[in-house]
Design a protein with these regions (language model features):
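Terminal targeting signals and extreme-terminal segments of soluble enzymes
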Residues: 1-72, 79-129
Length: 129
C-alpha cells in the first residue's frame, strides 16, 4: 500500500460549540486529501473523461482535535474493481489515531454521469507501487 500524507492545522473556523474540530471539517479534509492524492496519482495522464463520485462514507471518531493542533492525515487506496474504489483515511494528533474513515467512490463518465467500469489504466494508477 502506498500512503499519501498531508498536514492540517486546526483554525478557529474548524471549531464547533464543543470547542473541538467539527465532524463536517473532517469530512471536508477527507475530500481534500482524496483530491490531493488523486491529483498526484494521475499526474501526466488525461483522465478528463471520468470523475469520481462518493457513494458512501464511514467515519469513526476516536479522539478529538483542538484549536492550534497539527493533524497528520494519511490516505491510501484499498480494494478497487468494477466501478468502485475504496479509499482509507486516518487522522493523527501527536501520533495517536483520532479519526478513521473509509470512503467508497464510483467512477462515472464525465459527460453522461453514468457509472463506468474502472479502466486498466486507472487501475494501474491506483495499484500500490
Amino acid at each position: 500500500m502506498t500512503v499519501f500524507e498531508t498536514k492540517y492545522t486546526v483554525k478557529p473556523a474548524h471549531i464547533d460549540e464543543l470547542n473541538h474540530v467539527n465532524n463536517v471539517v473532517y469530512l471536508q479534509w477527507i475530500q481534500d486529501i482524496a483530491n490531493l492524492h488523486w491529483t498526484q496519482l494521475k499526474r501526466g495522464v488525461d483522465t478528463t473523461a471520468y470523475v469520481w463520485v462518493v457513494i458512501r462514507h464511514e467515519i469513526d471518531y476516536i479522539g478529538q482535535a483542538l484549536m492550534g493542533d497539527t493533524i497528520v492525515a494519511k490516505t491510501w487506496v484499498g480494494k478497487t474493481g468494477g466501478i468502485r474504489s475504496i479509499r482509507h483515511v486516518e487522522f493523527y494528533k501527536n501520533n495517536k489515531l483520532i479519526v478513521r474513515a473509509q470512503t467508497t467512490f464510483c467512477l462515472v463518465n464525465a459527460k453522461t454521469f453514468k457509472p463506468t467500469r474502472i479502466t486498466n489504466q486507472i487501475l494501474m494508477m491506483l495499484a500500490p507501487k
